[in-house]
Amino acid sequence: MSPQTETKASVGFKAGVKEYKLTYYTPEYETKDTDILAAFRVTPQPGVPPEEAGAAVAAESSTGTWTTVWTDGLTSLDRYKGRCYHIEPVPGEETQFIAYVAYPLDLFEEGSVTNMFTSIVGNVFGFKALAALRLEDLRIPPAYTKTFQGPPHGIQVERDKLNKYGRPLLGCTIKPKLGLSAKNYGRAVYECLRGGLDFTKDDENVNSQPFMRWRDRFLFCAEAIYKSQAETGEIKGHYLNATAGTCEEMIKRAVFARELGVPIVMHDYLTGGFTANTSLSHYCRDNGLLLHIHRAMHAVIDRQKNHGMHFRVLAKALRLSGGDHVHAGTVVGKLEGDRESTLGFVDLLRDDYIEKDRSRGIFFTQDWVSLPGVLPVASGGIHVWHMPALTEIFGDDSVLQFGGGTLGHPWGNAPGAVANRVALEACVQARNEGRDLAVEGNEIIREACKWSPELAAACEVWKEIRFNFPTVDTLDDQA
């Protein structure tokens, strides 16, 4: 480090560069109940001690900068600085460490996920002293949680609105995701809902393109919802994607959905941004709309094990910002998702109090102090043969969201929906009778095929489909 140069001697100020660990590495610190706690996976550059790397993360994500500044004397750094209070090695990784950082609550604006992330992950990830950096988990204290509204409605209120209990909800993403006219799109929605699904869904990149403007889509989908409700006697919904280029346009689309009387709208919360998402969530609560959240772009942030941000952090942020559903992987489908890790952040979405459990990737005990829960959505490459595993893994409080697994049925969309509904009802009944879905799942589906030709045809089509690829983002071995 450069030698310090003494200036402004009369006020005790020493200019120059000093090691971060002298100020920001404080292993003696006892965390407070009001601190936001972060667990970072740190990969220092060669020659950088882990204590210096952890302290650098704490400094650059709170009050520090690369050199001493005389305005440090105008505030109380001990009150406002982040502190690296513990460092532990990652089992099996010689160059990686978990650095635990505590942030005073006063560093963050109330009710703002945007400000929280701007502080904690906004700048430090490009720091040259680090080869890589990943935010593995956050502990959000009750004092901060209470400044957020959270999900517009939550799990129980949604079930009451829909009058659906005792089973997972069923959905389908309309395919092809792009290119259909609004009228043909509405037809597909109607066929799926009439066949037995609870929801259909806009794909994440369906906004308002030349082939299908948003207002036309909303109108034809509303017609499909009302027609299918009249024919089935069940409440139906379609996730109308309100995501737009501006917040004002997004709210305009949500207002139109409310005027049509539909039950739910949708938002792409990462590409749309947390400020937009929180605004839409507040509107949905005030106006009785459910809010479905898609996580488009998440894998850019969370897939690599040594750099970025784990999805459990994005899931916690979504629960604060607000959403009634969020896509959470499938474990068994075509998209990335380790089973234990997925179960960990599914609990973080749904439950009120979650104990620390490193075997599931949960670094901190999290108390949501009665903030409403979020329904996890299993979506991506799933079909009827996956139904027993999905029911066993996710339980009743979930949405099982098919796409090609409904619309790819050889007899059409409505028979595809029938096959999904029959498979789900068979699995729920078998589970309620005490059968083990993990062991007897295939047999349960085969038995149901005997009285559902639609399910039998679906099983024949997808009997050979597998997505057997190793998971990239796996949990660490626990020593």
Swiss-Prot record:
The modification Phosphothreonine is found at residue 330. InterPro entries: RuBisCO (IPR033966), RuBisCo_large_chain_AS (IPR020878), RuBisCO_lsu_C (IPR000685), RuBisCO_lsu_C_sf (IPR036376), RuBisCO_lsu_fd_N (IPR017443), RuBisCO_lsu_N_sf (IPR036422), RuBisCO_lsuI (IPR020888). Signal peptide: none annotated. It comes from the Eukaryota. Residues 1-2 form a propeptide. The modification N6-carboxylysine is found at residue 201. Its cofactor is Mg(2+). The keyword Acetylation does not apply. The modification Phosphoserine is found at residue 208. Keywords: Calvin cycle, Carbon dioxide fixation, Chloroplast, Disulfide bond, Lyase, Magnesium, Metal-binding, Monooxygenase, Oxidoreductase, Phosphoprotein, Photorespiration, Photosynthesis, Plastid. One of its GO terms (molecular function) is ribulose-bisphosphate carboxylase activity. Its EC number is 4.1.1.39. RuBisCO catalyzes two reactions: the carboxylation of D-ribulose 1,5-bisphosphate, the primary event in carbon dioxide fixation, as well as the oxidative fragmentation of the pentose substrate in the photorespiration process. Both reactions occur simultaneously and in competition at the same active site. HAMAP family: RuBisCO_L_type1. Belongs to the RuBisCO large chain family. Type I subfamily. This is Ribulose bisphosphate carboxylase large chain. The gene is rbcL.
